[in-house]
A protein has these predicted regions:
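A short catalytic or substrate-binding loop motif that flags glycine-/basic-rich loops and adjacent residues
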Residues: 116-120
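Polybasic, low-complexity association/targeting segments
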Residues: 84-115
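A short, well-structured beta->alpha microelement
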Residues: 110-112, 130-145
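A generic short-segment signal for beta-strand/edge and adjacent turn/coil regions
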Residues: 90-97, 122-123, 151-155
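Active-site-proximal loop/helix of nucleotide/amide-processing enzymes and allied scaffolds
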Residues: 1-84, 137-244
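Short N-terminal helix-initiation segments at or just after the protein's N-terminus
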Residues: 60-72, 95-101, 125-129
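Short beta-strand scaffold segments in enzyme catalytic cores
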Residues: 122-129, 182-186
Length: 244
């Protein structure tokens, strides 16, 4: 395992609407299918530190690709780079990584998005594959971030329940089918987490899309029943509804 530390200027406030996070920590969302993934990012004051763990020694092209991605996506300018000595790292199974990621993401959503429930508009947390986190402010009843592939997303439902709309379920199906880990909806009374526990099956993908087509016409009780049935029968999706 190789570790790289990137020191970058902090212009994160331009990415989180009118709010500035004094510190944002993203830990241990590891993907065993790519060379380098961010295991920790800390942003304080005018500096940011991002640690990368790699399965093999990165080439100069790998490093250039990572730096270009960070600058393009986050608008952060890299002004220093330090590469440490390789260290031992035992790769665990993909399923174990997904389990760890679900537990971490659930706590991250509660920690970072809960303060925004007091605001009467939706907010979204997006985690990119390189470990960068973005919080975006949406409109009164919706928020949308176009563009890139995400490892995980979450958004708030202020003043309402954490039940998904048809668009929420379509977005969840697309994210999980594209290799993403999990998506969540946070409301004042509950948290809904939809996540992969293995490679998404075609049956589960079709079930999510079928549910998305009809969910807006369902009663509250019917939707809960459908979600519970999917959670109990699926081999590749887990659904958790947590009371707060």
């Amino acid at each position: 395992m190789r570790r790289e530390e990137l020191l970058v200027d902090n212009t994160l406030s331009s990415l989180v609407s009118s709010h500035t996070l004094s510190a944002l920590f993203l830990e241990a969302l590891l993907d065993i299918d790519i060379h380098c993934v961010a295991s920790k990012a800390a942003i304080e004051g005018d500096k940011a530190s991002i640690l990368y763990h790699c399965k093999r020694e990165p080439s100069q092209n790998d490093i250039d690709e990572v730096l270009a991605f960070i600058e393009r996506v986050t608008r952060l300018h890299v002004n220093a780079l330090h590469v440490s000595e390789p260290a031992r790292h035992e790769l665990r199974s993909h399923v174990e990584h997904l389990h760890e990621a679900r537990l971490y993401f659930r706590e991250l959503v509660l920690k970072t998005l809960k303060p925004y429930l007091a605001v009467n508009r939706e907010y979204m947390l997006v985690l990119l594959w390189r470990g960068i986190g973005v919080i975006a402010e949406g409109e009164r009843d919706k928020v949308h971030i176009p563009g890139s592939r995400y490892v995980a997303t979450a958004h708030t439902h202020p003043g309402s329940l954490c039940l998904p709309s048809g668009r929420d379920l379509e977005a969840a199906a697309a994210l999980l089918a594209d290799g993403g880990c999990c998506t969540a909806i946070l409301a004042p009374s509950c948290l809904l987490l939809i996540a992969r526990r293995d490679t998404l099956s075609l049956d589960d993908y079709d079930t999510l899309l079928a549910l998305a087509r009809h969910v807006d016409k369902m009663s509250f009780e019917k939707l809960l029943q459908k979600l519970s049935m999917l959670a109990s029968t699926s081999k590749t999706i887990t659904i958790q509804l947590l009371s707060l």
